[in-house]
Amino acid sequence: MKYGNMKKWAPLILFLFSLLLLQGISLHASSPSFSVNASYLASLPYANSHVAVVYYQGSLYIIGGDSHSNQVWIYSNGTWNIGPSLPFSLVSPSAIVYNNTIYVMGGYNSTGINPYVLKLNGNSWVVVSEMPLPAYSPYIFVYNNAIYVIGGENTTSPAGLYFPPSNAIRLFYPNNDSWRIIGYMPVPTYGGGYVFNGTSLIIVSGYIGYSAYTNDILIYSPQNNNWTILNGVLPYWIHDSALAYYRGVLFIVGGYIYTAGSGGVNNAILAYYNGNLQRVGYLPVPVYSAGYVQVGNMLYLAGGIGSSLSDVSALQLITFNFPPLPPKITSYSAGNESVTLGWNPVRLSSGYEIIYWNNMGFNSSINVGNVTSYTVTGLKDGITYYFEVLAYNSIGYSSPSSIIALTPASVPNPPQLVSVKYGNDNVTLNWLPPTFSGGYLLLGYYVIVKNENSMVSSHFVNSTSLTISNLTPNVTYNVFIYAVNKLGNSSPLVLTVVPITKASVFAFITKLGNGILVNWTTSFPANITLELYNPNGNLISQIAAIKGNSSYLFRVPQGNYTLVIIASNSAGVSKYVYQVVYYLPPASPQVSLIGFGNNLYISWNNEANVITYLVYVNNSLVYEGPSNSIVTNISNGTYLVKVIGVNPAGSSSPGIAVIHYTGDYVTVVKMKVVNVTIVSKIASAVSGNGNNLSLGQSIVIILLAVMILLSIAIITRNRSNGFDW
């Protein structure tokens, strides 16, 4: 289905309404030095119009259009290939290349105006966003990492075409697929030719609504969101033309023209420059509503609507031929009776000419051909010559380059840098003598040191090496080295130095369960060596030649250590010493109690990382030491026992046990043990954690067994004597 038929006839319909409003304007101008060539490059796979065209990865992409509206064709090296199809049909879309991919916006189809933003992802299209205030054929360009989408037609209804098109200035941000409306056009236009020249959007003519067109040129500056209107530039109204901008000249190609009393498809190529408009060429196939894209000094037109108001299949190429831009001399040196010049290559140039002269009435020129360096010979030593380079092609000559003044055998060539070595707040420079001494013996070298535009120091040396001291680290200095002979100084060898100093180390030490983690940074680049010593001063680990900021984990047991960090660079060696107390807080001990014969036997398990234990009985300290059992005297009463493990990292939570004791060493029948049963409880207490019995615990068990036997004997005797139990 051809959705574009409405658009083909819209210009003619609107033209009939606008004839009474048109006023003629006549412009006359002389042509600058350029020419325009237009050629029929190839045929599209089929006739089409209202397509979008981009230049992507060295190929032309023809997107959508009035025919086969979801198809994409790729033209490369004279061959057509089918590209990735659009997910839906699009007539009059706009497309742009950004960040090495293609974005397609706007357009319409049988369902209405397309609001979706398509992005080429590999070999398929994906929808990444929706356009606010959707429109087709908007003006689209990239500036400052945003895609500007301006104006466009906002209706597909033939009746609605009478009203003004969209005037919104929309910004799309590809980094997060978001939109923002930042303003509005002073004159809403649709179908005007447009081009973005890198700093400004230029729109020529276009439909403004109410059956009216404009013959103005609108210029939009995205830098400040401002518009400039050049009123009445065109002698007629023109719709759906193609635009290009090159070397300060605006080219208007094709389009549908409305003049006083008539209209038709334009075959002219117009140039607007210096406030003047002039026809400079003709299209092989007159068209309007063609897709187009500018690539350098070339403009490609794909398809369009021809003179019979039907689609055409022409792919046309318009080439804008200008004289080259002036070259820039990039290198120069004086030799013995000679001067060597080098310059940058200039696009569109077919050759170069050197013009040179002196102040004694001599002048000459040399056509050196298509090269970018040349040695002029036959000069006289001691005489100053002036040189400039021009580029040329079939259109004409460029402006001359900047003038370079050189005197053969007058002063030396500049020295040649060998090395720069940074020390502690100093820098040592080494260089070679110049390749040409100027024809005289070298007297020495001037070395000038500047900080921005301020003189820091100056030196005159007879050697090819110099150490510059008392420099401030991290400050940029410019150093100029001149070779000197009796006629003067060479041009300088210029270099930039940023002095350094010995690196400071900033360390962060973290105590982990599996070792000591050391993180560090340095104030200047340096090689790092880590050394870890035990309390006896013995080196137990060394990690050498670590470059850059990093970290390292020492897997060592808990204890006291000395960490040494050594930072070395060309400025010297820095050493930093850290005392590391590597302990983790201990766990709470498990306490066992036995009361027997006015003695309280207290024991506990050994906890890892404990250096000493504190034992409290009824909040009185009765023991401090490394043992895991003690014996203390008690009398009748209740006893609260706390055992606390201690190391340099801190104290554990207390292990707590309670016993209520009655009786004495002889009479134990009234003894009551709280939390600890007699033999079986003791056995479980000493063996439940899987540890071997200590000597103290073994003695306690033996004594307890004896006392149990003694108690049984006493009980038996008392019962036989009639005592109460």
From Swiss-Prot:
Where is each Fibronectin type-III domain found? Answer: 323-410, 411-504, 505-583, 585-665
Keywords on record? Kelch repeat, Repeat, Signal
Q: Which Gene3D superfamilies match?
A: Immunoglobulins, Kelch-type beta propeller
Q: Which SUPFAM superfamilies match?
A: Fibronectin type III (SSF49265), Kelch motif (SSF117281)
**Signal sequence interval, chain numbering:** 1-28
Kelch repeat copies, ranges: 59-100, 101-145, 146-199, 201-248, 250-297, 299-342
Q: Which InterPro entries match?
A: FN3_dom, FN3_sf, Ig-like_fold, Kelch-typ_b-propeller, Kelch_1, Striated_Muscle_Regulatory
The name on file for this protein is Kelch domain-containing protein SSO1033
